[in-house]
Amino acid sequence: MDISSWFESIHVFLILLNGVFFRLAPLFFFLPFLNNGIISPSIRIPVIFLVASGLITSGKVDIGSSVFEHVYFLMFKEIIVGLLLSFCLSLPFWIFHAVGSIIDNQRGATLSSSIDPANGVDTSELAKFFNLFSAVVFLYSGGMVFILESIQLSYNICPLFSQCSFRVSNILTFLTLLASQAVILASPVMIVLLLSEVLLGVLSRFAPQMNAFSVSLTIKSLLAIFIIFICSSTIYFSKVQFFLGEHKFFTNLFVR
């Protein structure tokens, strides 16, 4: 092997490495157990390159002149595919984060909001708890294997350095699913809190000297924790596991 072919092999390897990197990088920015709050950037970037180097299949990728001519466009396409994949894999965590925010809003505890390092946003205590709960269940149920399967599926649907067509309209369906599932999962607690508000209102009407609403936060918090304890081992646990077996959220975003 002469020096020119050796440099060409290195050039091809670096292009493949960057292509895989741009698809994997959004995963490490969006997933709550891989982002800035958990893994520092100085460690995360080398880890992404290490994982990307293990996913390179140079023998199965056709590196032609068109790749070098449109390399920036193809890299941008890889970023879009990585973002769509990250959105789909982050769906259960976003849903449970929204569930915690809805419950805290209904029980009047949003004053305790603080900066969540795992998400980088102003979040409530229950939102952080549900986010960690979903991450634990996700990893306990084989979530890392599911992530690798999803990455493999993304390359089957949209191979490296090939053109893909996206269904932009299905992104609205994705957002609808996010909002609807959050409301559905929070509905048992919301119903109980609504009934407690009604009972406290009746009590305050007939016994105003008791000042029932001064203890409403405590009562609603106890009721919310009780309902969450009942639902956590059945509804919430099974819902996270349900998303582990669903690849359709990602596949529906592409025209095949």
Curated annotation (Swiss-Prot):
GO cellular component, one term: plasma membrane
Subcellular location, record wording: Cell membrane
Transmembrane segments: 13-33, 37-57, 79-99, 129-149, 183-203, 217-237
InterPro entries xref list: T3SS_IM_R, T3SS_SpaR/YscT
Alphabetic keyword roster: Cell membrane, Membrane, Plasmid, Transmembrane, Transmembrane helix, Virulence
Short name of any one Pfam family annotated for the protein: Bac_export_1
Its membrane topology: Multi-pass membrane protein
A biological process from GO: protein targeting
Function text: Required for surface presentation of invasion plasmid antigens. Could play a role in preserving the translocation competence of the ipa antigens. Required for invasion and for secretion of the three ipa proteins.
Family, similarity comment: Belongs to the FliR/MopE/SpaR family.
Name used for this protein in its record: Surface presentation of antigens protein SpaR
Gene encoding the protein: spaR
